[in-house]
């Protein structure tokens, strides 16, 4: 899919069902998210509304169909860190490695820069040995986008009767 066919726009609460459909397989079949329970449609609508009050919540469309989304939120809940944001991104599983994630992050970084954000962080589930629940593709994506490893939390996630590490990746914009 050529990247020029991808349209980026702000998410609305009307997008919640589609975004939830993208997110659900990540909850059910991967350790990419530590959510164990799929949020309700109303919870997802509320998330879009709450995030959008202070940060961008973006969707990527191709021919009117949403293929992925990303949003930013406060990284540390202290005033001295208000120039920092944490990133989250989810792309429809069949549309990974198509440019959707790159376009979402490029637009997000541009908007956050204009908003006065200076530091971006991504907390990514990590495994020393890839398995059916987790590869390190998210880490590789972030590194391609210019993020560098800034921290490592050991065995901080439990899902599918296993423990997973989380690494913190950072990018100064």
Language-model-detected regions and their locations in the chain:
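Conserved acetyl-CoA-binding loop-helix of GNAT-fold acetyltransferases
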Residues: 97-113, 136-140
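Conserved GNAT acetyl-CoA-binding A-motif
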Residues: 112-134
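Conserved GNAT-fold acetyl-CoA-binding loop/helix
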Residues: 20-47
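C-terminal "cap" of GNAT-fold acetyltransferases
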Residues: 135, 155-173
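Acetyl-CoA-dependent GNAT
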Residues: 38-94, 105-106, 111, 172-173
